[in-house]
Amino acid sequence: MEALKKLAGVTAAQYVTDGMTIGLGTGSTAYYFVEEIGRRIKEEGLQVVGVTTSSVTTKQAEGLGIPLTSIDDIDCIDLTVDGADEVDKAFNGIKGGGAALLMEKIVATPTKEYIWVVDESKLVDHLGAFKLPVEVVQYGADRLFRVFERAGYKPSFRMKGDKRLITDMQNFIIDLDLGCIENPFDFGRLLDQTVGVVEHGLFNGMVDKVIVAGQAGVTVLEANQST
């Protein structure tokens, strides 16, 4: 599995060219993309500037000597490469297994070309088997948990050891065990309108390409060619 993830990440790095501002994703597959960018900077003299999606990726990028800038200092990003936990046939996805969904979506929004790198196990017919992360403010989180519980969403707080995980933005994450999300757009809008929800892990209609690594090699799926 690690070999497939590395293959997807290295393939995505081929889309990066000199002068780009690039979004550096978070997670086990995006990790290899960031590593390959670091290698190309060192060995090929690649000239890029990165914008990171988590403190973990920031630390990785700094260790590799990748020049970084703040999302607040730029208007657009040429290319962002990130992982995904599930991708359906309509190119909607669930992200946030690494608890970085808020920063990931902030970086994805001003991106000209948004690429996901996944192994073939992440391709699904319907989203929802992977628990949907919902980032919530700490104030009122238990009340919101009960709201989700009454709605039948089977919520659970994301934990780190015996304490609730706190995200880079100092929020909690409530994971929803939905089983199947029939309409990701409708459910995303419902969460967007829920007071106390900062962001959710539904990335609907955002991705341009999905690079899939499987036993037979790498496949590049183009979202605009989907039916």
UniProtKB/Swiss-Prot annotation:
As recorded in UniProt, its EC number(s) are: 5.3.1.6
Supply the SUPFAM superfamilies for this chain.
D-ribose-5-phosphate isomerase (RpiA), lid domain, NagB/RpiA/CoA transferase-like
- Which positions does UniProt annotate for substrate binding? T26, G27, S28, T29, D82, G83, A84, D85, K95, G96, G97, G98, K122
- Could you name the active-site residues? E104
Family indicated by similarity: Belongs to the ribose 5-phosphate isomerase family.
Purpose: Catalyzes the reversible conversion of ribose-5-phosphate to ribulose 5-phosphate.
Specify the protein name.
Ribose-5-phosphate isomerase A
Q: Give the species.
A: Streptococcus equi subsp. zooepidemicus (strain H70)
